[in-house]
């Protein structure tokens, strides 16, 4: 009997590495969010190794990489790269199709996508960059956890 196959998405951003593995029913099999502290290769390797220990060695995983730091990793691992705004849009359309608007805050920028009769996407300018890092700084200042 063939093993179940999964899809995986890796987002290598300016401050974090995120990995999600899902089955054909869109159920999350594995998920990790880790700060890379500018050591993208080591953090990516840790997250991927951890995922591999949780999966059967015979499991087939179709993997796509995105994010501002993902293009180098995709090239290194010879995996498909997709631009992050496109990745976010496709994911929202697939998993939560009733969505009207999606806002994505990253470490370097913010993006907003309006869904409807026609798709409209906008991204902030460089003068407003670091939105995710700003949220982290404010959480530290307020002595709270930005991950909650």
Question: What do the predicted segments below correspond to?
Answer:
Residues 11-15, 67-68, 105-109, 131:
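A short acidic Gly-Thr/Ser loop motif
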Residues 117-148:
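Glycine-rich phosphate-binding loop plus the immediately following alpha-helix
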Residues 84-102:
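Active-site cofactor/substrate anionic-group-binding motifs, chiefly glycine-
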């Amino acid at each position: 009997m063939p093993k179940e196959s999964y899809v995986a998405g890796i987002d290598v951003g300016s401050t974090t590495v995120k990995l999600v593995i899902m089955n054909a029913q869109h159920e999350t099999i594995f998920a990790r969010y880790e700060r890379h502290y500018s050591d993208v290769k080591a953090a990516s390797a840790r997250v991927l190794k951890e995922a591999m220990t949780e999966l059967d060695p015979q499991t087939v995983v179709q993997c796509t990489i995105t994010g501002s730091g993902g293009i180098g990793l995709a090239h290194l691992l010879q995996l498909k790269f997709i631009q992050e705004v496109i990745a976010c849009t496709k994911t929202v359309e697939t998993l939560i199709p009733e969505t009207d608007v999606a806002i994505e805050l990253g470490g370097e920028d913010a993006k907003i996508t309006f869904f409807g009769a026609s798709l409209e996407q906008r991204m902030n300018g460089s003068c407003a960059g670091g939105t995710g890092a700003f949220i982290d700084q404010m959480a530290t200042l307020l002595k709270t956890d930005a991950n909650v």
